[in-house]
């Protein structure tokens, strides 16, 4: 049976400043922690990435031609405030005005994120969001943007608060590269949620036009053996780290008893304590009903087993399938030997997980208002067909189709889902995989920066026109 998506559904493509723009030191942009981290640890940098800083008119023309009517863009904080505060870089401000103008000219609605993994280096060195001064600077930056860019109708404060804490302090694959520090993980989550709440409250108090929300990565966690209490507990604890703690802060304005019990257990085993003030709870509570929408980024699910032992994570950055290991002291271990297809990077392809996660939000957080799927897509070692100047990415089409199908099911079952943004619009730079891992509708030749629509782009165009998942 053919499934249909609503007539007002957004068929979007997603980007992020640092992964797309390039121009990392151009026109007064300040440094971010990633600049130094990549120079010191990797064989690639984010220069020139997809050169979106100069080529955005090309990408937006392609968007219009291929039926993409929404784009996720992030503003690079250090392009506006090179140090994160203080002096404004006027050239950066002009760039984003020009970019948003081009979006509207091409009938592509910009959904704009204020922070996508790129805290200015000056603030990052000073503790990033573990330092509460960064919260104040972020709110000042947010207020500047709300005032300066009234042409933006859809704002999100942060992209993926969970993976920031996880990447910086648990897995250690983001700067500053700290591993297994649960105190820092939860404190980062919490402080960023306070920053989010303050920005949302300010947006509403000052009556800015438009809508505001937040983008959370919500990977679904299942027990490997649902009849084994240890596996069930491991899935619950892993869910608290990645999903429940942050969702509670967003929509309950506090942390539920089960959430705090899980956090205290993890910290008692690993050491550390969480600092939360009454003022924090007050602002979380004041903001909990003010989010106009939730952005859900979903790529994969995980299966958890009970585990007694030390923390050890091996991150698969090469795309050699089977290279991953993930076990956390006091939490559990991920089981990769499950009967579910997975990518070369060991990401479990499980569309049902997206359905389950959407319906979990609907059930547990009824004040969610509406949902956009703000990222979903398939990372692949695309093979470019020189003769036909395209990529025959049938696996990507199949992946998108399966996930859109469960979105249609969730809508039919009462979820208010208003749009889908494919990660990514064009091929972009990947944080921990460089230029090997491609996601785009449009193939980018990173040598020449030419764009070539993939087979998936033609499929997406037909989908956007018919709204039918075929």
UniProtKB/Swiss-Prot annotation:
Superkingdom per UniProt: Bacteria
Enzyme active site: 160 (proton donor), 375 (nucleophile)
Pathway given in the UniProt record: Carbohydrate metabolism; lactose degradation; D-galactose 6-phosphate and beta-D-glucose from lactose 6-phosphate: step 1/1
EC number: 3.2.1.85
Record-level GO cellular component terms: cytosol
Molecular-function GO terms, alphabetical: 6-phospho-beta-galactosidase activity; beta-glucosidase activity
The family this protein is said to belong to: Belongs to the glycosyl hydrolase 1 family.
PANTHER family linked to this entry: GLYCOSYL HYDROLASE, LP05116P
Name of the featured protein: 6-phospho-beta-galactosidase
Source organism of the structure: Staphylococcus epidermidis (strain ATCC 35984 / DSM 28319 / BCRC 17069 / CCUG 31568 / BM 3577 / RP62A)
Taxonomic lineage: Bacteria, Bacillati, Bacillota, Bacilli, Bacillales
Gene: lacG
């Amino acid at each position: 049976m053919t499934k249909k998506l609503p007539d007002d559904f957004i068929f979007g493509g997603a980007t992020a400043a640092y992964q797309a723009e390039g121009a990392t030191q151009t026109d007064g942009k300040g440094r971010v922690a990633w600049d130094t981290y990549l120079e010191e640890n990797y064989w690639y940098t984010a220069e020139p990435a997809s050169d979106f800083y100069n080529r955005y008119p090309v990408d937006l023309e392609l968007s219009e031609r291929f039926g993409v009517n929404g784009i996720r863009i992030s503003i690079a904080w250090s392009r506006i405030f090179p140090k994160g505060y203080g002096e404004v870089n006027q050239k950066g401000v002009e760039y984003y005005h020009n970019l948003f103008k081009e979006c509207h000219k091409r009938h592509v609605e910009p959904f704009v994120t204020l922070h996508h993994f790129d805290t200015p280096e000056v603030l990052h060195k000073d503790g990033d969001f573990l330092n509460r001064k960064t919260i104040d600077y972020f709110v000042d930056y947010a207020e500047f943007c709300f005032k300066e860019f009234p042409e933006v109708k859809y704002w999100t404060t942060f992209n993926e608060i969970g993976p920031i804490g996880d990447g910086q302090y648990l897995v250690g694959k983001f700067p500053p590269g700290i591993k297994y520090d649960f105190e820092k993980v939860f404190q980062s989550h919490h402080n960023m949620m306070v920053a989010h709440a303050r920005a949302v409250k300010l947006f509403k108090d000052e009556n800015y036009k438009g809508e505001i929300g937040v983008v959370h990565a919500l990977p679904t966690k299942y027990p490997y053996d649902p009849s084994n209490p240890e596996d069930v507990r491991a899935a619950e604890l892993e869910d608290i780290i990645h999903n429940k703690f942050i969702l509670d802060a967003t929509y309950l304005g506090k942390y539920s008893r089960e959430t705090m019990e899980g956090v205290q257990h993890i910290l008692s085993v690993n050491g550390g304590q969480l600092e939360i003030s009454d003022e924090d709870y007050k602002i979380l509570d004041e903001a909990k009903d003010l989010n106009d929408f939730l952005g859900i980024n979903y790529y994969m699910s995980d299966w958890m087993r009970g585990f007694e032992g030390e923390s050890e994570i091996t991150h698969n950055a090469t795309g050699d399938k089977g290279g991953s290991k993930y076990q956390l002291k006091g939490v559990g271990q991920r089981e990769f030997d499950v009967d579910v297809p997975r990518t070369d990077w060991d990401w479990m392809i499980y569309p049902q997980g997206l359905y389950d996660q959407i319906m979990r939000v609907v059930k547990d957080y009824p004040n969610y208002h509406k949902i956009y799927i703000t990222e979903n897509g398939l990372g692949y070692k695309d093979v470019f067909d020189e003769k036909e100047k395209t990529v025959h990415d049938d696996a990507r089409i199949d992946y998108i189709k399966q996930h859109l199908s469960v979105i249609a099911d969730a809508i039919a079952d009462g979820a208010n889902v208003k749009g889908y943004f494919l990660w990514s619009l064009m091929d972009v730079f990947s944080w921990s995989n460089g230029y090997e891992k491609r996601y785009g509708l449009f193939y980018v030749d990173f040598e020449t920066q030419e764009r070539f629509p993939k087979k998936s782009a033609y499929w997406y165009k037909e989908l956007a026109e018919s709204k039918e998942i075929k």
